[in-house]
Amino acid sequence: MKPENKLPVLDLISAEMKTVVNTLQPDLPSWPATGTIAEQRQYYTLERRFWNAGAPEMATRAYMVPTKYGQVETRLFCPQPDSPATLFYLHGGGFILGNLDTHDRIMRLLASYSQCTVIGIDYPLSPEARFPQAIEEIVAACCYFHQQAEDYQINMSRIGFAGDSAGAMLALASALWLRDKQIDCGKIAGVLLWYGLYGLRDSVTRRLLGGVWDGLTQQDLQMYEEAYLSNDADRESPYYCLFNNDLTREVPPCFIAGAEFDPLLDDSRLLYQTLAAHQQPCEFKLYPGTLHVFLHYSRMMKTADEALRDGAQFFTAQL
């Protein structure tokens, strides 16, 4: 679609979203558009420091977990000693960016609002790691903590997965992987999915929305996919195109959050409509006036804080 035909998104977003877009960080260098992935990752980490400030304090522990690929870093956020469940968090970043630091505030707030232990998994990034390595390492970490729950003093009898953007896909893919391969890591009480992508290759929102403001043009989305997948056949894998998986049975309760001006919004709508049509427990909520990645901006956006509270409330209601 010609850029001129797209919606004038920056004119339509909410006042608080505009405040975020217009917030300048004077000490921050320019985005290294032509730089290496390593430089872009470094910039992303620096840029997120401002948005992560002021998060709730709580007991935090870091552990390296063994997998067949090597060790993966994890970070445990423990808001109380008697947690009713454990929630695994997978960060967004198009499979190529992000880490436990870039999403620190999100995980702390989720732990605070749910009063559950949250474990962030620093899964391997692409293109160094190709599909399905990230999912396999997430599952390995889940199994490790299930086996060592007593040693780490965590409750693994009931678990959940949560993620934003690419992390939302990984969250649901990991839950389906455990179901399909009959791996016991505790009862999956719920899955929290903020503005994820789940397998659509084209849609109305992908045509009308997306630009330099969110890094989600059709060219951007193609680049993320090519970095993540090992080959063309992976596009149809039921753990990448999740609509090719069986969504008619034993899908854990899903909280599906959509951002109004997100090109990936139709992925969330289709996921909700598919699950609802087959009587799978799910809830969809649209957050008006928001862009993709709005969850990061709870320092300024009440809507971002609301979205985290909504997800936490949904999860605890399943326990």
Swiss-Prot record:
Displays esterase activity towards short chain fatty esters (acyl chain length of up to 8 carbons). Able to hydrolyze triacetylglycerol (triacetin) and tributyrylglycerol (tributyrin), but not trioleylglycerol (triolein) or cholesterol oleate. Negatively regulates MalT activity by antagonizing maltotriose binding. Inhibits MelA galactosidase activity. One of its GO terms (molecular function) is carboxylic ester hydrolase activity. InterPro entries: AB_hydrolase_3 (IPR013094), AB_hydrolase_fold (IPR029058), Acetyl_esterase (IPR023508), GDXG_lipolytic_enzyme (IPR050300), Lipase_GDXG_HIS_AS (IPR002168), Lipase_GDXG_put_SER_AS (IPR033140). A motif (Involved in the stabilization of the negatively charged intermediate by the formation of the oxyanion hole) lies at residues 91-93. The keyword Ribosomal protein does not apply. The gene is aes. This is Acetyl esterase. It comes from Shigella boydii serotype 18 (strain CDC 3083-94 / BS512). It is found in: Cytoplasm.
